[in-house]
Amino acid sequence: MFLLNASRLGAGSRLFSSAGVQFAKKRGQAAKEAVEVDLVDVGDYVKKATERFQHTVELHKKRLGQMKAGKPDATMFDGLAVGNEKQKFTELAATSVKGKNMLIVTVFDPKDTKRVASAIVGAGLNVTTERVLENQQQLKISLPPVTTETRERLCRDMKKVFEEYKNSANRHSLGHVRSEVLKELKKLDKKNDSVRKVIQEIENLHKEYTAMLQEQLKHAEKNAMR
């Protein structure tokens, strides 16, 4: 645990006189302007950063795991936002697997079917969407056949996901987390040894977790090309 003397009121004050620089105050002034000490556990910043970095790695792994070439996945639309209201897909519809390359989306309210279909088409997932004629609340989603081209496209999409979680405006990206933590640390006394050590530790953690993301991407790409 690192303890930082964050601020001292009255410390470092200078009194100039014809006799030179004086570093003492009268007892009455000293009592009035007592030193205020704030103890800050800067080591806690390491703990918080580690927790947030770990959460990012878990989200990245889950996201890559959902990206499977040609394999139907009932959760593939769960992250979509529907309409201008940006409603969660899961609040409006449910998805089930049918056969080797098909999904059935059941919309809870018929009036939302068109909006849900538009969200799926607009997501750029390279799927074919059509209404089930006998049921206006259902959409039939056909997945494309798996080819070398689709596998390579999947790998490119995975790389985009990697970049998003590595360094982007996404509040879960490693870069965003690093910037927020360092911003808070630099409000403290950067000349203090404890603060400098913690800043360096945050930088080292950032590098370690970036390497973890790279390993996850490498593993996902390998599976995609099989």
Swiss-Prot record:
<dbReference type="GO" id="GO:0005739">
    <property type="term" value="C:mitochondrion"/>
</dbReference>
<comment type="function">
    <text>Necessary for protein synthesis in mitochondria. Functions as a ribosome recycling factor in mitochondria.</text>
</comment>
<dbReference type="GO" id="GO:0043023">
    <property type="term" value="F:ribosomal large subunit binding"/>
</dbReference>
<dbReference type="InterPro" id="IPR036191">
    <property type="entry name" value="RRF_sf"/>
</dbReference>
<comment type="similarity">
    <text>Belongs to the RRF family.</text>
</comment>
<keyword id="KW-0648">Protein biosynthesis</keyword>
<dbReference type="InterPro" id="IPR023584">
    <property type="entry name" value="Ribosome_recyc_fac_dom"/>
</dbReference>
<dbReference type="GO" id="GO:0032543">
    <property type="term" value="P:mitochondrial translation"/>
</dbReference>
<dbReference type="GO" id="GO:0006412">
    <property type="term" value="P:translation"/>
</dbReference>
<keyword id="KW-0809">Transit peptide</keyword>
<protein>
    <recommendedName>
        <fullName>Ribosome-recycling factor, mitochondrial</fullName>
    </recommendedName>
</protein>
<dbReference type="Pfam" id="PF01765">
    <property type="entry name" value="RRF"/>
</dbReference>
<dbReference type="InterPro" id="IPR002661">
    <property type="entry name" value="Ribosome_recyc_fac"/>
</dbReference>
<keyword id="KW-0496">Mitochondrion</keyword>
